A protein has these predicted regions:
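Active-site-proximal beta-alpha core segment in soluble small-molecule metabolic enzymes
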Residues: 2-6, 10-13, 23-196
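Active-site anion/phosphate-binding pocket segments in diverse small-molecule metabolic enzymes
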Residues: 3-6, 12, 175-363
Length: 363
């Protein structure tokens, strides 16, 4: 038996810390099924803490939230789109669209007018993320969304920080570009609506960038750079159990490719968890710059992987995985420890890579 366990109180406490630090309304970002934790459950718990605004990337997720009873909450769809079917979904869900291009503005305007409605929207400025958003030098086009689209009621403006966890100069540069656009609009007599820029790391690093709201996702899970330093608890763990213990002689090998050779007589615990369950699975590393390489090296050294080591917890003991992680199993060195069959094993996994066969349990 294995399950991914999520502690409700940890999530609530993280939310309280975030809301206090922000000091302004918080958009709870629930993209990718709530970062793998379950969008429906995350929304329920965060609403209990006072969250009244949500953000998603997919138009259908906005409708799901409405269907689950979130009829009064603001829901921001953070993905700009020039596809009429997606714009229609946003309008029908009474969600807030993101407009990040002249094409997206035209599409949303036409769809909303065709529905006999006025769609709410936030204008997005691309200050360096490179995906969605008007470029800062497209001021004329940005202004038209406010003044020349009768089917759109612009209620906000925002940007997306790309390096708020590490690069202060770049982040401040992005913020400055957004503020410049806002100043231009206001100078032309336009009420820009809700202004927001700070994301999960931005909330904790830049007190002067909170504006009217913030957008927070991964910080709710405690899985951000320096999360513990900010008082956040890491949310979620994979729970399994020891199904067999055995003793092998010196020289015995472990895993495909005989990745480890026992240096002495070794007592082993077998746990039925592998990369099919998301254990030891991670996204491909981005190694575009030397500092990216150094960051991964630093992290690996801190958690033991710099020496090829992977650890899990069994009955409260930190134990080493022997050999390569298999599809469905791992063998662990429990020599000298009072560990027996049935003992609980705790493993750290990214819930985005969990097998759909693994049950999520909120406790």
């Amino acid at each position: 038996m294995k399950k991914f366990v999520i502690e409700r109180e940890k999530l609530k406490e993280n939310a309280r810390i975030i809301e206090k630090k922000a000091g302004v309304p918080v958009f709870a970002v629930l993209k990718a099924d709530g970062y793998g934790f379950g969008m429906k459950q995350m929304a329920e718990i965060l609403k209990e803490t006072g969250i009244r605004m949500f953000a998603v990337t997919e138009p259908e997720d906005a409708q799901r939230l409405r269907d689950w009873g979130y009829t009064e909450e603001d829901i921001l769809v953070m993905r700009s789109t020039a596809m009429a079917d997606e714009a229609y979904q946003v309008v029908q869900a009474n969600a807030i669209a993101t407009v990040g291009s002249p094409e997206a503005a035209q599409c949303l305007n036409e769809v909303a007018q065709g529905c006999g409605m006025q769609a709410k929207a936030h204008v997005k400025i691309d200050t360096g993320m490179g995906r969605y958003g008007f470029l800062p030098d497209q001021y004329a086009e940005i202004k038209k969304v406010y003044t020349a689209c009768p089917g759109i009621q612009v209620t906000g403006i925002y940007t997306h920080f790309h390096s708020s966890f590490a690069d202060e100069a770049a982040t401040r540069g992005q913020y400055k570009q957004l503020c410049h656009i806002i100043s231009q609009l206001e100078a032309d007599g336009i009420c820009v609506g809700m202004r927001h820029a700070a994301n999960s790391n931005g909330v904790f690093r830049y007190d002067d960038m909170m504006l009217d709201a913030v957008r927070v996702g991964s910080a709710f899970t405690g899985r951000i750079v320096n999360g513990a330093k900010y008082g956040l608890s890491r949310l979620g763990y994979l729970e399994s159990r020891v199904i067999e213990t055995r003793t092998v002689p010196k020289g015995h090998t472990f895993g495909y490719g005989a990745g480890y050779v026992a240096k002495d007589t070794t007592r082993v615990a077998v746990v039925p968890v592998g990369y099919t369950d998301g254990f030891s699975v991670e996204k491909k590393r981005d190694l575009f710059r030397p500092r990216d390489v150094m960051r991964y090296v630093k992290n690996d050294l801190e958690d033991g992987r710099g020496k090829g080591n992977i650890y899990i917890s069994i009955a409260g003991h930190r134990v080493r995985v022997l050999g390569h992680v298999g599809l469905c199993h791992v063998s662990c060195d429990v020599t000298g420890l009072d560990i027996k069959n049935g003992d609980t094993a705790i493993l750290d996994v990214n819930p985005l890579y969990l097998s759909p066969l693994v049950t999520k349990e909120y406790v």
